[in-house]
Amino acid sequence: METRKPAERLALPYSLRTAPLGVPGTLPGLPRRDPLRVALRLDAACWEWARSGCARGWQYLPVPLDSAFEPAFLRKRNERERQRVRCVNEGYARLRDHLPRELADKRLSKVETLRAAIDYIKHLQELLERQAWGLEGAAGAVPQRRAECNSDGESKASSAPSPSSEPEEGGS
């Protein structure tokens, strides 16, 4: 318990409590506070030592990041992060709803969900190209094959066949 009278304790704003050492107007006799708001009892001998050659490289007390440790700030930050994670998870759930039914029974990770969605989209594109080729093929036009890109970052040689792809049709 503190033995000082309330008049002896002076609560200064944090910006004044982190003033450079040895600057006129600073009050080294006042109890300093750390970022967790616990009073630090430093007598005049400690302040002299801090100003001496032992601490030549340190001209300032450590500046506390006051707002980053406030409970309200932490609660708001954590709630924003929880909301962001909820939205991301909801997006993955909606994406899984659009995948073929054979994948609905499996528990897919986020990466597996993205890869399955990419494979399924490629499969649907191939079906559309085949359908377009079938319609235009009767008229004698040859469909132009667009350049293939691997948007999932894997090389073409390492990509496995799509779990949602249909078996190739037999010969003509």
Swiss-Prot record:
Ranges of biased composition (kind: Basic and acidic residues)? 145-155
Question: Where would you say this protein principally sits, based on its record?
Answer: nucleus
Q: Which Pfam families match?
A: HLH
Query: Does this entry carry the keyword Nucleus?
Result: yes
Q: In which tissues is it expressed?
A: Expressed in skin. 7-fold higher expression in fetal skin than in adult skin. Weak expression also detected in fetal lung, aorta and brain, and in adult stomach, kidney, ovary and breast.
- Molecular functions per Gene Ontology: DNA-binding transcription factor activity, RNA polymerase II-specific; protein dimerization activity; RNA polymerase II transcription regulatory region sequence-specific DNA binding
Tell me the Gene Ontology biological-process terms attached to this UniProt entry.
regulation of transcription by RNA polymerase II; skin development
Residue ranges with Low complexity bias? 156-165
Q: What is this protein called?
A: Achaete-scute homolog 4
Supply the gene name. Answer: ASCL4
